[in-house]
Every structure is written in structure tokens, then in C-alpha cells.
Amino acid sequence: MDMTTTIILSIAVFLGIVLLLVALLLLVRNKLMPKGEVRITINDDKELTVPVGNTLINTLAEQKVYLASACGGKGSCGQCKCRVVEGGGTILPTEVGFFTRKQIQDHWRLGCQVKVKENLKIVVLQSILNVKEYECTVVSNCNVATFIKEFKVQLPEGEHMDFIPGSYAQIKIPKFDIKYADFDKELIGNEYLPSWEKFNMFDLRCVNTEPTVRAYSMANYPAEGDVFMLTVRIATPPFKPDHSSFMNVNPGIASSYIFSLKPGDKVLMSGPYGEFHVKEHDNGNVGPSTGSGTLLPEMIWVGGGAGMAPLRAQIMHLTRTLNVRDREMHYFYGARALNEVFYLDDFRQLEKDFPNFHFHLALDHPDPAADAAGVPYTPSFVHNVMYDTYLKDHRAPEDIEYYMCGPGPMSAAVVNMLDNLGVPPENIMYDDFGGGAPTK
């Protein structure tokens, strides 16, 4: 047997072994992979017949039951919580950190971590069953600050969504390859373009290789019609250590997608989600106070950046819709400079129309533009402004209701300050759809 024949036979034997192993793997996979259909019973009421093999969150979404998810089902936000009272196996290590011992005993799970392999009985919030998905049309998408857009979409004709101010929506993000150079510069605006050019923003590119979803708080309140209105901050890569340019990593997937959209574009949105709502008193009353003679607690909102969204919705609903005039209300908002503050005119007008409402602006540093415009502000971080200008001399800060949404460091500083003032945790409400409320 010559050398050529030996080589050919060796290759043939090798390929035969590889093909045999592949066939065995496919056979084993076919035997081990679950097949067929199972039943999912929801709240002892609704029963679904579904195929096996997918995660619970995706299986339910295919049946138009939408669990909340701010991370696209990656197990990092902890929002897709539900009780799996039958089936589903034991809780996974990836889930444990999101629940207390009592919740684990009560069978709480993350929908993105539960595989549908057998019949399941689950319990979800009733509000989840009211969530719908809509194909919406972009109405406007203009910058309201250097790196923040007001993104507004219209629900389809004939559709209506009931929601409580402070709720959030989810947007479906498709696969894409987006170059920031293709962004519509008119939608960014001449006021903000110099900063974009200074930081070489138009050199960035974002690639998304698989569909996902992201969550954003709604800035609109019900009286503004059948729309979703979000405030979205572009998530840039971190700077290199020498601050010469951005690191070569992907910018934010969802914010890049939203910033690329133009009026007339179609997007898939679902909602409403969330429990960041104004506390109810006296059988559902949030204000005005009832005729019992007892005033409802004072309210303080504190926000920064795109965290403006749910706070605006709550404040506008209480004032413009419910006409609450006998609850003391204060809104503390922090920004780097005056040109980063949006909806300012709305809140200054509220101060004129509602003597019980007060807007407090905190800017990081003295701002000549604010001084020239005659806009009242205090130069400091927002938690310091809250304490120094109001809470320090307040007779009972522990009785106030606090509503908070903004960057993590801001929230942590505010919580620490309120904790030192003796404010109980139940009086501090967070917009926490992104996972992880501030800790002390």
C-alpha cells in the first residue's frame, strides 16, 4: 500500500468516526431534549397549552403574557418575578440573591431562569395580565439635554392603555448595526451638537447581534393621551484611562437604537409595568385630602438626569389632573448645568398655579447661564440641597413620603441622608425597574 492510499484511508476513517460521533450526539440530544406540550396555569384561572423547552418568560410572551424584564431575560435585573407553586424545579443560584428567605419559601422565581419542561402552576400580579404589546409610531425624538432625548410614540389607532403615573414601558430592540454618524443631527439640535462633536460621538458604532428588550419609565401621564413618552440617556462606552477617547466597546444597545429612530418609524412597545406609584390613603385616595380633617402626608420627589420621567408623570397627574392643593409637595432636581435641565418651564408654571408645589433646582457648580437667565438654583449636589435648604430644619422629615429616580450615586447619597434623619424605609419609594434599589 503506497503512502497516498494510506493517507486517503486515514482521512476516511477519521471522517467516519467524526460522523458517527455527530450521529450519536444528535441521537442522545433527541432522547434527552423534552418534547411535546405542557400546561401552564396562571392564578388558578387561565390555562395555557405550550411547547416545552423555552424559558418561562419567553413562553409566556409567546402567549401574550408579558412579565417585566429590564435586562432582556439575562437574569441581571430581577424584574421577571413570579411564584411557581407547582413544577419548575428548585431555585437556581442565579436567582437566590433577588429574594428573601421567606420569598424563596413562598416559591418566588425569576421567569427568565425557569425552563418549561413540565406542567406549571404560577401566580403573577393581576396587572401583568393587563399588559399589552403595541406596534407604535414614532411621533418625535428630539434632544432635551446634551445626551438625553424625549422619545414619544403613538399607540395604534383605536388602542388605549390605562396606567398609573410612575409606570414603565418596555421596548423591543431588534438586531442592528448602527453608526452614530447616521443619526439625524437636526433631532439632536444645534444647542447640543458642539458637545457631540467635542467627544467624537459620531465616530461610535453599535452592533446588536440578538433581539432583546429594555425598560424605560414613562414621562407622560394619562391625560396626555395614548402615547408612550420616555426620557432616554445615551449610554456611551467608558473613557480610556487617559481620557483621550472612548474605549473600544459597544455603546448602550437600547439607547443607541432609540437615538437612531426618526418620526414615522415603527417600534414594538409593551406596558404598563411597575409598582412605583404614589401611595394610596383612605381607600385609594392619593389627594386631595378627604373630608375627615386629616391632611395627607407631605411629598418630596428627588431626581436627576433621565430619572425625571416618572417623577414628572406623578407630579403632573396630581396637579393638572387631580388638582391637589392641600398636600405640600416639593421637587428637588439635580443637574450639571442649566442647559441639562428639561421641563423647567412646566415646573416653574406649576409653582405659579399651585402654591403648595415648590421646585428646587440643584446645579453641580455656579452657572453663569442660570444667573443670567434669573433661574433660581443652589450650587451643590441634590442631596445636600435637600438637607441644607429644607430638611435640616423640618420638624418631622420622617413623616414625609419620598419618591426617587436618578443615577445610582445620587440615590445612594439621598438614602443615606434620609436614613440619618430617621426616615423609615417604607416612606422611601424608588423607581427600581433597572434592578437594585439603593442600599444603606
Where are these predicted regions, by residue range?
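Fe-S ferredoxin-like electron-transfer domains
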Residues: 21-27, 31, 97-154, 159
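Cysteine-centered iron-sulfur cluster-binding motifs in ferredoxin-type domains/subunits
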Residues: 69-78, 111-115
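Short, charged beta-turn/beta-strand-edge "cap" motif at the junction between a beta-strand
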Residues: 116, 128, 175-178, 271-276
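Short coil-to-beta-strand transition motifs
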Residues: 127-136, 207-214, 341
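Ferredoxin-reductase
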Residues: 139-265, 289, 336, 363-366
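A short, basic/flexible loop-to-alpha-helix module at the beginning of a structural domain
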Residues: 257, 271-295, 392
